[in-house]
Amino acid sequence: MYMKEKRDEILLKIIDLYIKSGQPVSSKQLISEYKLAVSSATIRNIMADLENEGFLEKTHTSSGRIPSISGYKFFAEHSKSKTNELLESKLKEIFSKRYLSIDVTLDEAAKAINEIIGLTLVTSSNVNTEVLKSIQLIELNNYSATIILVTSTGQVANKTIDLTNFQDIKLEDVRIAIRLFKERLINTSLINLREKALALKPILSKYIKNYETILQSFIGNVFEFENKNHVYGKSNIIKQEGIDRLHLTQILDLIENNSIWNMIESKVEEDETLKIDVRNSNISLISKKIFVNNTTKEISVIGSNRMDYISAKSAIALLESFIKPKFSKKNN
Protein backbone atom coordinates (compact mmCIF):
# COMPACT_ATOMS: atom_id res chain seq x y z
CA MET A 1 0.00 0.00 0.00
CA TYR A 2 1.34 3.44 -0.93
CA MET A 3 2.46 5.86 1.73
CA LYS A 4 -0.03 8.62 2.52
CA GLU A 5 2.10 11.22 0.71
CA LYS A 6 2.09 9.13 -2.46
CA ARG A 7 -1.62 8.47 -2.15
CA ASP A 8 -2.30 12.19 -1.75
CA GLU A 9 -0.24 12.83 -4.87
CA ILE A 10 -2.32 10.30 -6.81
CA LEU A 11 -5.53 11.91 -5.54
CA LEU A 12 -4.37 15.35 -6.71
CA LYS A 13 -3.58 13.94 -10.16
CA ILE A 14 -6.96 12.20 -10.44
CA ILE A 15 -8.82 15.40 -9.63
CA ASP A 16 -6.56 17.50 -11.83
CA LEU A 17 -7.29 15.22 -14.79
CA TYR A 18 -11.03 15.24 -14.09
CA ILE A 19 -11.10 19.05 -13.89
CA LYS A 20 -9.36 19.23 -17.26
CA SER A 21 -11.40 16.57 -19.05
CA GLY A 22 -14.75 16.43 -17.26
CA GLN A 23 -14.70 12.66 -17.72
CA PRO A 24 -14.42 9.90 -15.06
CA VAL A 25 -10.77 8.96 -14.59
CA SER A 26 -9.60 5.36 -15.01
CA SER A 27 -6.32 3.88 -13.83
CA LYS A 28 -5.05 3.53 -17.42
CA GLN A 29 -5.86 7.15 -18.25
CA LEU A 30 -4.07 8.36 -15.13
CA ILE A 31 -0.94 6.33 -15.84
CA SER A 32 -0.88 7.48 -19.46
CA GLU A 33 -1.48 11.18 -18.69
CA TYR A 34 1.16 11.51 -15.97
CA LYS A 35 3.59 8.76 -17.10
CA LEU A 36 3.31 6.99 -13.76
CA ALA A 37 5.70 4.10 -13.15
CA VAL A 38 3.11 1.95 -11.37
CA SER A 39 0.73 -0.78 -12.43
CA SER A 40 -2.97 -0.34 -13.15
CA ALA A 41 -3.72 -2.73 -10.30
CA THR A 42 -1.87 -0.50 -7.84
CA ILE A 43 -3.74 2.59 -9.04
CA ARG A 44 -7.09 0.76 -8.86
CA ASN A 45 -6.36 -0.23 -5.26
CA ILE A 46 -5.48 3.36 -4.37
CA MET A 47 -8.65 4.58 -6.06
CA ALA A 48 -10.70 2.08 -4.08
CA ASP A 49 -9.10 3.28 -0.83
CA LEU A 50 -9.74 6.92 -1.74
CA GLU A 51 -13.35 6.07 -2.57
CA ASN A 52 -13.79 4.37 0.80
CA GLU A 53 -12.37 7.46 2.49
CA GLY A 54 -14.90 9.68 0.72
CA PHE A 55 -12.56 11.54 -1.64
CA LEU A 56 -13.70 9.83 -4.85
CA GLU A 57 -16.98 8.52 -6.22
CA LYS A 58 -17.71 5.85 -8.80
CA THR A 59 -20.19 6.63 -11.55
CA HIS A 60 -22.80 4.13 -12.74
CA THR A 61 -21.85 4.52 -16.39
CA SER A 62 -18.08 4.17 -16.13
CA SER A 63 -15.42 2.26 -14.25
CA GLY A 64 -13.58 5.53 -13.66
CA ARG A 65 -13.83 7.81 -10.63
CA ILE A 66 -14.85 11.40 -10.14
CA PRO A 67 -14.11 13.70 -7.17
CA SER A 68 -16.53 14.02 -4.27
CA ILE A 69 -17.07 17.32 -2.46
CA SER A 70 -14.35 16.25 0.01
CA GLY A 71 -12.06 15.45 -2.92
CA TYR A 72 -12.54 18.87 -4.49
CA LYS A 73 -11.93 20.51 -1.11
CA PHE A 74 -8.71 18.52 -0.66
CA PHE A 75 -7.54 19.54 -4.13
CA ALA A 76 -8.41 23.20 -3.58
CA GLU A 77 -6.47 23.30 -0.32
CA HIS A 78 -3.42 21.21 -1.25
CA SER A 79 -2.76 21.84 -4.93
CA LYS A 80 0.40 23.85 -5.55
CA SER A 81 0.51 27.21 -7.29
CA LYS A 82 2.04 27.61 -10.73
CA THR A 83 3.60 30.58 -12.49
CA ASN A 84 1.67 32.30 -15.26
CA GLU A 85 4.31 34.40 -16.99
CA LEU A 86 1.81 36.38 -19.06
CA LEU A 87 -0.23 37.36 -16.00
CA GLU A 88 2.88 38.15 -13.98
CA SER A 89 4.16 40.42 -16.74
CA LYS A 90 0.80 42.20 -17.03
CA LEU A 91 0.49 42.75 -13.27
CA LYS A 92 4.06 44.04 -13.14
CA GLU A 93 3.13 46.59 -15.81
CA ILE A 94 -0.02 47.64 -13.92
CA PHE A 95 1.71 48.00 -10.55
CA SER A 96 4.60 49.97 -12.06
CA LYS A 97 2.23 52.86 -12.82
CA ARG A 98 2.76 55.74 -10.43
CA TYR A 99 0.17 57.82 -8.61
CA LEU A 100 -2.66 55.29 -9.00
CA SER A 101 -4.69 54.59 -5.87
CA ILE A 102 -4.90 51.06 -4.56
CA ASP A 103 -8.53 50.78 -5.70
CA VAL A 104 -7.76 51.85 -9.29
CA THR A 105 -4.75 49.52 -9.39
CA LEU A 106 -6.77 46.63 -8.01
CA ASP A 107 -9.48 47.28 -10.59
CA GLU A 108 -6.99 47.06 -13.47
CA ALA A 109 -5.38 43.95 -11.97
CA ALA A 110 -8.71 42.16 -11.55
CA LYS A 111 -9.62 42.93 -15.17
CA ALA A 112 -6.28 41.48 -16.29
CA ILE A 113 -6.81 38.27 -14.29
CA ASN A 114 -10.28 37.89 -15.78
CA GLU A 115 -9.03 38.43 -19.34
CA ILE A 116 -5.93 36.22 -19.11
CA ILE A 117 -7.19 33.33 -16.97
CA GLY A 118 -10.95 33.59 -17.45
CA LEU A 119 -12.00 33.62 -13.81
CA THR A 120 -14.95 35.29 -12.13
CA LEU A 121 -13.50 37.64 -9.50
CA VAL A 122 -15.05 39.76 -6.79
CA THR A 123 -13.13 42.54 -5.05
CA SER A 124 -14.25 44.63 -2.11
CA SER A 125 -12.88 46.89 0.59
CA ASN A 126 -13.77 47.04 4.24
CA VAL A 127 -14.63 50.71 4.71
CA ASN A 128 -14.66 50.24 8.48
CA THR A 129 -10.87 50.52 8.43
CA GLU A 130 -10.70 53.65 6.24
CA VAL A 131 -10.64 57.28 7.35
CA LEU A 132 -11.78 60.53 5.74
CA LYS A 133 -8.86 62.49 4.27
CA SER A 134 -10.59 65.24 2.29
CA ILE A 135 -14.01 66.85 1.79
CA GLN A 136 -14.63 69.44 -0.93
CA LEU A 137 -17.64 71.39 -2.21
CA ILE A 138 -18.33 71.99 -5.91
CA GLU A 139 -21.31 74.23 -6.60
CA LEU A 140 -23.41 73.19 -9.59
CA ASN A 141 -25.96 76.03 -9.46
CA ASN A 142 -27.78 78.10 -6.84
CA TYR A 143 -29.67 75.08 -5.55
CA SER A 144 -27.34 72.09 -5.78
CA ALA A 145 -23.76 71.07 -5.16
CA THR A 146 -21.54 68.02 -5.31
CA ILE A 147 -19.62 66.97 -2.23
CA ILE A 148 -16.39 65.12 -3.00
CA LEU A 149 -14.93 62.92 -0.29
CA VAL A 150 -11.56 61.15 -0.46
CA THR A 151 -10.67 58.29 1.88
CA SER A 152 -7.33 57.04 3.17
CA THR A 153 -7.13 54.43 0.39
CA GLY A 154 -7.74 56.95 -2.37
CA GLN A 155 -11.39 56.03 -2.79
CA VAL A 156 -13.34 59.01 -4.16
CA ALA A 157 -17.05 59.40 -3.43
CA ASN A 158 -19.25 61.99 -5.14
CA LYS A 159 -22.46 62.90 -3.32
CA THR A 160 -24.96 65.47 -4.59
CA ILE A 161 -27.06 67.73 -2.38
CA ASP A 162 -30.22 69.21 -3.91
CA LEU A 163 -31.72 72.21 -2.09
CA THR A 164 -34.64 72.75 -4.49
CA ASN A 165 -37.21 71.66 -1.92
CA PHE A 166 -35.52 73.46 0.98
CA GLN A 167 -36.14 77.17 0.50
CA ASP A 168 -34.89 77.93 4.00
CA ILE A 169 -31.46 76.46 3.20
CA LYS A 170 -28.89 78.36 1.15
CA LEU A 171 -25.63 77.20 -0.41
CA GLU A 172 -23.84 79.53 1.98
CA ASP A 173 -25.11 77.32 4.80
CA VAL A 174 -23.62 74.28 3.06
CA ARG A 175 -20.30 76.12 2.66
CA ILE A 176 -20.22 76.81 6.38
CA ALA A 177 -21.02 73.18 7.16
CA ILE A 178 -18.24 71.96 4.85
CA ARG A 179 -15.74 74.31 6.53
CA LEU A 180 -16.68 72.98 9.97
CA PHE A 181 -16.53 69.37 8.75
CA LYS A 182 -13.04 70.01 7.36
CA GLU A 183 -11.93 71.31 10.73
CA ARG A 184 -13.54 68.55 12.80
CA LEU A 185 -13.97 65.37 10.74
CA ILE A 186 -10.74 64.89 8.78
CA ASN A 187 -8.98 61.63 9.85
CA THR A 188 -12.23 60.30 11.31
CA SER A 189 -12.93 56.65 10.45
CA LEU A 190 -15.76 56.28 7.93
CA ILE A 191 -17.71 54.07 10.28
CA ASN A 192 -17.75 56.89 12.88
CA LEU A 193 -18.50 59.79 10.52
CA ARG A 194 -22.23 59.96 11.17
CA GLU A 195 -21.80 59.79 14.94
CA LYS A 196 -19.09 62.46 14.91
CA ALA A 197 -21.19 64.70 12.66
CA LEU A 198 -24.13 64.46 15.06
CA ALA A 199 -21.84 65.53 17.88
CA LEU A 200 -21.25 68.80 16.00
CA LYS A 201 -24.85 69.98 16.53
CA PRO A 202 -23.94 72.63 19.15
CA ILE A 203 -21.28 74.15 16.87
CA LEU A 204 -23.41 74.03 13.71
CA SER A 205 -26.33 75.68 15.53
CA LYS A 206 -24.18 78.78 16.19
CA TYR A 207 -23.57 79.43 12.49
CA ILE A 208 -26.50 77.88 10.61
CA LYS A 209 -30.14 78.68 11.36
CA ASN A 210 -31.62 75.45 9.97
CA TYR A 211 -28.62 73.32 10.84
CA GLU A 212 -30.68 70.17 11.53
CA THR A 213 -31.87 69.96 7.91
CA ILE A 214 -28.32 70.19 6.60
CA LEU A 215 -27.03 67.75 9.19
CA GLN A 216 -29.67 65.14 8.33
CA SER A 217 -28.87 65.54 4.64
CA PHE A 218 -25.19 64.83 5.28
CA ILE A 219 -25.86 61.95 7.64
CA GLY A 220 -28.46 60.33 5.39
CA ASN A 221 -26.61 60.80 2.12
CA VAL A 222 -23.11 62.25 2.13
CA PHE A 223 -21.68 60.32 5.08
CA GLU A 224 -23.26 57.00 4.07
CA PHE A 225 -20.57 54.49 3.08
CA GLU A 226 -21.08 50.81 2.30
CA ASN A 227 -18.79 47.93 1.44
CA LYS A 228 -19.20 47.64 -2.33
CA ASN A 229 -18.43 44.58 -4.41
CA HIS A 230 -16.92 44.80 -7.89
CA VAL A 231 -17.57 41.73 -10.03
CA TYR A 232 -15.32 40.85 -12.98
CA GLY A 233 -16.00 38.17 -15.58
CA LYS A 234 -19.57 37.41 -14.55
CA SER A 235 -20.10 35.69 -17.90
CA ASN A 236 -17.42 33.13 -17.02
CA ILE A 237 -19.51 31.57 -14.28
CA ILE A 238 -22.71 31.84 -16.33
CA LYS A 239 -21.07 29.74 -19.06
CA GLN A 240 -19.81 27.02 -16.72
CA GLU A 241 -21.49 23.64 -16.97
CA GLY A 242 -23.31 21.89 -14.16
CA ILE A 243 -24.70 24.94 -12.33
CA ASP A 244 -28.49 25.00 -12.46
CA ARG A 245 -30.30 28.28 -13.09
CA LEU A 246 -31.70 28.58 -9.55
CA HIS A 247 -28.30 28.24 -7.87
CA LEU A 248 -26.74 30.51 -10.49
CA THR A 249 -29.27 33.26 -9.78
CA GLN A 250 -28.70 32.91 -6.04
CA ILE A 251 -24.92 33.02 -6.28
CA LEU A 252 -24.95 36.04 -8.62
CA ASP A 253 -27.10 37.92 -6.12
CA LEU A 254 -24.82 36.89 -3.26
CA ILE A 255 -21.55 37.89 -4.91
CA GLU A 256 -22.89 41.31 -5.87
CA ASN A 257 -24.29 42.23 -2.47
CA ASN A 258 -22.41 40.26 0.20
CA SER A 259 -18.95 39.61 1.55
CA ILE A 260 -17.69 36.34 0.04
CA TRP A 261 -15.39 35.98 3.04
CA ASN A 262 -18.31 36.09 5.46
CA MET A 263 -20.25 33.58 3.34
CA ILE A 264 -17.58 30.93 3.87
CA GLU A 265 -17.62 29.12 7.19
CA SER A 266 -14.67 26.80 6.54
CA LYS A 267 -11.07 27.92 6.72
CA VAL A 268 -7.68 26.64 5.58
CA GLU A 269 -5.84 26.29 8.88
CA GLU A 270 -2.37 27.00 7.46
CA ASP A 271 -3.41 30.46 6.27
CA GLU A 272 -5.90 32.44 8.32
CA THR A 273 -6.33 34.95 5.48
CA LEU A 274 -7.58 32.35 2.98
CA LYS A 275 -10.94 30.56 2.94
CA ILE A 276 -12.18 27.88 0.55
CA ASP A 277 -15.68 26.48 0.22
CA VAL A 278 -16.83 23.69 -2.11
CA ARG A 279 -20.61 23.36 -2.11
CA ASN A 280 -23.05 20.61 -3.03
CA SER A 281 -24.76 23.09 -5.37
CA ASN A 282 -21.68 22.85 -7.66
CA ILE A 283 -20.41 26.25 -6.55
CA SER A 284 -16.88 26.80 -5.25
CA LEU A 285 -15.61 29.93 -3.51
CA ILE A 286 -12.06 31.05 -2.72
CA SER A 287 -11.64 34.23 -0.69
CA LYS A 288 -8.48 36.01 0.41
CA LYS A 289 -8.06 38.92 2.81
CA ILE A 290 -5.15 41.25 2.13
CA PHE A 291 -4.24 43.75 4.85
CA VAL A 292 -2.61 46.95 3.58
CA ASN A 293 -1.97 49.81 6.00
CA ASN A 294 -5.33 50.63 7.61
CA THR A 295 -7.58 48.87 5.13
CA THR A 296 -8.63 45.34 4.27
CA LYS A 297 -9.04 44.19 0.69
CA GLU A 298 -11.07 41.09 -0.10
CA ILE A 299 -10.24 39.19 -3.30
CA SER A 300 -12.49 36.26 -4.18
CA VAL A 301 -12.87 33.77 -7.03
CA ILE A 302 -16.17 32.06 -7.81
CA GLY A 303 -16.74 29.10 -10.11
CA SER A 304 -18.15 25.61 -10.45
CA ASN A 305 -16.62 22.71 -8.55
CA ARG A 306 -14.50 22.06 -11.65
CA MET A 307 -12.97 25.53 -11.53
CA ASP A 308 -9.25 25.93 -12.16
CA TYR A 309 -8.24 26.03 -8.48
CA ILE A 310 -4.52 26.11 -9.26
CA SER A 311 -4.80 29.18 -11.49
CA ALA A 312 -7.19 30.85 -9.04
CA LYS A 313 -4.89 30.41 -6.04
CA SER A 314 -1.84 31.35 -8.10
CA ALA A 315 -3.48 34.56 -9.34
CA ILE A 316 -4.52 35.58 -5.82
CA ALA A 317 -1.03 34.88 -4.44
CA LEU A 318 0.58 36.81 -7.29
CA LEU A 319 -1.76 39.75 -6.76
CA GLU A 320 -0.94 39.85 -3.04
CA SER A 321 2.79 39.78 -3.80
CA PHE A 322 2.39 42.97 -5.87
CA ILE A 323 -0.07 44.81 -3.60
CA LYS A 324 1.84 44.70 -0.32
CA PRO A 325 5.21 46.07 -1.49
CA LYS A 326 3.62 48.91 -3.50
CA PHE A 327 1.05 50.11 -0.99
CA SER A 328 2.71 49.46 2.36
CA LYS A 329 3.27 52.63 4.41
CA LYS A 330 7.03 52.58 4.10
CA ASN A 331 6.72 52.88 0.31
CA ASN A 332 4.13 55.67 0.32
UniProtKB/Swiss-Prot annotation:
The gene is hrcA. Keywords: Repressor, Stress response, Transcription, Transcription regulation. It comes from the Bacteria. The keyword Repressor applies. Belongs to the HrcA family. It comes from Mycoplasma mobile (strain ATCC 43663 / 163K / NCTC 11711) (Mesomycoplasma mobile). One of its GO terms (biological process) is negative regulation of DNA-templated transcription. This is Heat-inducible transcription repressor HrcA. One of its GO terms (molecular function) is DNA binding.
